[in-house]
Amino acid sequence: MDDLLAELKSEMDAAGVDADVEFSLPTLELTAALDATIDDTSQLYTDDPPHHYTDTPLTGDDLPLLEAWLDDAQLHGVGDDIIAEYIDEVLLVLITVRGGACGKELLQDVRRLFGADVSPGTMYPHLKQLADAGLLEMSELTKRKVYRVADAQAAIEHVDSVVLQLLTFAVGLQTIMADCIVNQSADPQPQDE
């Protein structure tokens, strides 16, 4: 893998890409898996509802796409209020990665990925709204409902749009904060005597 990274870096240098880029194996695996998911969305859902559904715990072995992120301290540092604010996007990503999930699995996934305790009273209305909006399909089984992505491209575009807005906001806020720090250090407040 190191040879591939070195080859990629040298190709970037030869192409005149002027950037200090660092690669890590989990980042590349996640990016490659995401690219494969976006290119081949046919496996994300099926047209026929399943006849039998078995709970599958979210593990690194079962879902290599999220392996680098499971039990990650940075993700566990995200506040429950932020998770609740963006629960639609979180649910769409988790259901897309899984290819389908029931509510119990999604609650466990959110807890495992983010350390957040989202209540069923918060999550289930959002699943219904996503289904009503045509982003999810819901199959009713004997003891549970299974949610699948109805239109993978629409789901990806929705999440991508929200993520872009969040990144733009975060970069803008961080830039303003950096300017404030620079201005304060350049113009110290007079001390009271």
From Swiss-Prot:
Keyword Transcription in record: yes
InterPro entries: ArsR-like_HTH, Tscrpt_reg_PadR_N, WH-like_DNA-bd_sf, WH_DNA-bd_sf
Effect of V159D: No longer activates transcription, does form probable dimer
Keyword line: Activator, Cytoplasm, DNA-binding, Plasmid, Transcription, Transcription regulation
GO MF entry, a single one: DNA binding
UniProt binding sites for DNA: K143, R144, K145, V146, Y147, R148
Induction of synthesis: In PHH4 (a deletion of the p-vac locus) detected starting late in exponential growth, increasing in level by stationary phase and remaining at that level (at protein level). Transcribed in all growth phases, maximal expression in mid-stationary phase. An unstable 6kb transcript able to cover gvpD-gvpE-gvpF-gvpG-gvpH-gvpI-gvpJ-gvpK-gvpL-gvpM is detected, as well as smaller transcripts. Not translated in strain PHH1, which has an intact p-vac locus. Gas vesicles appear earlier when grown in static culture, possibly due to O(2)-limitation.
Any GO CC annotation of this UniProt entry: cytoplasm
Subcellular location: Cytoplasm
Regulation: Degraded once GvpD is translated; degradation requires 'Arg-494' of GvpD; tested in transgenic H.volcanii. Fusion of green fluorescent protein to its C-terminus partially protects it from degradation.
A Pfam family the protein falls into: PadR
Region (Leucine-zipper), start-end ranges: 153-184
Additional detail: Encoded in a 14-gene locus called c-vac which produces cylindrical gas vesicles only in the stationary growth phase.
Protein role: Plays a regulatory role in gas vesicle synthesis, required to activate transcription of the c-gvpA operon. Gas vesicles are hollow, gas filled proteinaceous nanostructures found in several microbial planktonic microorganisms. They allow positioning of halobacteria at the optimal depth for growth in the poorly aerated, shallow brine pools of their habitat.
The protein's assembly and partners: Homodimer. Interacts with endogenous GvpD, also with GvpD from H.mediterranei.
Protein's name according to its UniProt entry: Transcriptional activator GvpE2
Naturally occurring in which organism (per UniProt): Halobacterium salinarum (strain ATCC 700922 / JCM 11081 / NRC-1)
